[in-house]
Amino acid sequence: MEKYMFLFLGGDPSHLSPEKQQAHMQKWFDWVEKMKNEKRYVAGEALMPGGKTVTGPKKVVTDGPYAESKEVVGGFFVILAKDIDEATKLAKDCPDYDLNGIVEVREVVKFE
């Protein structure tokens, strides 16, 4: 099995009612539990909105990324899958698609 990273972009549930937000989070908990039971889940975290960016040779620091952007990374998982196709299939179970979320699937490089 190889390691793959899911980068979660968009999919902001903040406009939902508290009850719908809770139901949405339960879908996430269920998805993580399913992957843990299948021995696929390695790690994952949600990220706070905002932050800082450091850019270029002069290491210019600016505010951002901005939470209003549709392509801000909101979190990540590292999972195990046999190949990119299987990882992509697993990513299709992400609960954020109902909120127009995006999941970027990337293989983790092995340095040996």
Give the residues covered by each predicted segment:
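Conserved, structured core segments of small domains
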Residues: 1-112
